[in-house]
């Protein structure tokens, strides 16, 4: 804020940053997070879908985000496939392995569950005051960061597949606590460089219209 000849002038200081060299259209997978029904893994003769888990049709957003980050950080080319690989193919198995890694021995689903169970207002405050600064620090350090999008409120663990994982690579913010735009690679929207999350102290939105109640920094 500045005062000049009796007038109060508010100056908005905008800061922007992004991971150098990363764009979803170039470095992201070129197919959408849409998979045919089928088991992601088998436990011996057991099909895990019989107990309500492990169906590819529920999505592999965590594995896709992890795969993209790993390829970028190691300088490996991204596969040119424009359609999701078949169940059991080498690329499918590679993404599934990283999906399992993204769950961090089930610690990540627990974090999603805790966030979804929070009072909505408390989740907004936690996102702005705790999670967003961690995301920003990772990007400022030049690192892609996986983040979780909370899209439902409640305590039913069977609803966790409504939530989502994406990869943040840039931001623009007007102050340490927002309003803020986070640029993301979203596995549901391949080859799009314009997907973003808008955060403020009064609520959140995703540029593609999906509900967004909160954000958590994963790793």
Predicted regions mapped to residue ranges:
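Short loop/turn segments at secondary-structure transitions that flank enzyme active sites
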Residues: 37, 67-71, 153, 172-174, ...
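Short, positively charged and aromatic/hydrophobic N-terminal segments
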Residues: 1-2, 7-10, 15
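Cys-His-centered catalytic/binding microenvironment captured across papain-like cysteine peptidases
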Residues: 158-163, 172-219
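Active-site-adjacent substructure of cysteine-protease-like catalytic cores
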Residues: 124-184
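Cysteine-nucleophile protease catalytic domains, especially the papain-like/related folds used
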Residues: 18-129
